[in-house]
A protein has these predicted regions:
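Bacterial Sec-dependent N-terminal signal peptides
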Residues: 1-27
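N-terminal acidic, glycine/proline-rich low-complexity segments
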Residues: 21-342
Length: 342
């Protein structure tokens, strides 16, 4: 009897060890971030969320492409990359993009210009030249050409200019495919922050700053698209009390300093861009998804959804309970320390 018990115990031990040897870990998401950082502070919050996902091994951040013009934007993202401990993430910038220089306080420039009492830059940089960063559509082609088929998720939380230019691009040193062919082959999903589906008379900012580009992307992008519309992020506000009280450990923090520079404190800010990033990283568990269909952009910049089983466009919705849960989740992520600062 004892012999049988010993044999059973050994068998169970082997089974447990064998089970532990099987990894249930999901593969990290290959993500490209597309942002108009420097316009609204929610881009900086969205970047924080992405860096924490990189720290956790949930994301490979292949690159950050910027659709707001000006050297301060690229330099600010370089500061973020460096501060969060990911200095080698490639950057792509835009030239001759949407005219948005006077649309808001440029918190990116405010942080770039910050100095210590000794007159030195307040934040470290990695790049030596912020004027000659690669053009975003070229970086897209380089990154997509090197990626596995249907492996890349793009989170676009600004204007559609870079994505439109990518679709229009031709063969180059990185790929013989056209831009549209390259996207169709390599991209799994595009997640955007754009539009408004509760009120068709609303002309949402990310759309109206480049209406032709938004039209092209929503109507011609060859993979599934999920968009987080204005009405979702407007229900979920990041609290000023968190900015004021939850970062005492950090000293100078480039996201916190940007938040303080963007508007007169204290203010709570809508989380339009973080909601799109959250869906790109964690999927629909926090949201309700619309049915499948088509999204068209009017000449004035309205976004119109038409249901259809053959459509590949969907948009996010949230009720009050979901909004509260997402807000708490954002606070938990954003107030946590980056891996390089624990």
């Amino acid at each position: 009897m004892k012999t049988n018990n010993i044999i059973l115990a050994i068998s169970l031990s082997i089974a447990i060890v064998s089970g532990c040897g099987k990894s249930s870990k999901t593969e990290p998401i290959n993500l490209i971030m597309e942002t108009d950082i420097g316009n609204d502070i929610d881009d900086a919050i969205a970047m924080d969320i992405i860096y924490k996902a990189v720290d956790a091994g949930k994301v490979n951040l292949l690159g950050v492409c910027i659709n707001k013009e000006g050297s301060a934007t690229g330099e600010y993202v370089d500061i973020l990359n460096t501060w969060y401990g990911h200095p080698d993430i490639p950057l792509g910038i835009i030239h001759n993009g949407a005219d948005c220089a006077a649309d808001a306080r440029n918190y990116a420039k405010a942080v770039v210009d910050m100095r210590t009492p000794e007159g030195k830059p307040a934040f470290a940089r990695t790049l030596k030249d912020h004027e000659n960063i690669i053009e975003a559509p070229v970086l897209y082609r380089k990154l997509l050409a090197g990626a596995k088929n249907k492996s890349v998720v793009i989170a676009s939380v600004g204007f559609s200019t870079n994505l439109s230019r990518l679709l229009e691009s031709g063969p180059d040193e990185y790929s013989k495919l056209t831009g549209k062919e390259l996207v169709e082959k390599k991209v799994k999903l595009l997640v955007t922050m754009a539009g408004d589906f509760e009120n068709p008379k609303v002309h949402e900012y990310n759309v109206v700053k480049d209406i032709p580009a938004a039209k092209k992307v929503f109507e011609e992008w060859p993979t599934p698209v999920v968009t987080s519309p204005w009405e979702v992020g407007s229900k979920i506000k990041y609290p000023a009390t968190s900015i004021e009280n939850d970062f005492k450990w950090a000293g100078l923090h480039p996201m916190v300093e940007a938040y303080k520079a963007y508007m007169d404190m204290p203010y709570d800010r809508e989380t339009w861009d973080p909601t799109a990033v959250l869906y790109a990283l964690e999927g629909e568990k926090w949201f309700t998804l619309s049915e499948q269909g088509f999204i068209n952009v009017s000449d004035e910049g309205s976004t119109l959804f038409k249901p259809g089983k053959k459509g590949t466009r969907r948009y996010l919705l949230v009720d009050d309970e979901q909004a509260e849960a997402i807000k708490a989740h954002f606070i938990e992520i954003v107030t946590s320390r980056p891996a390089n600062r624990k």
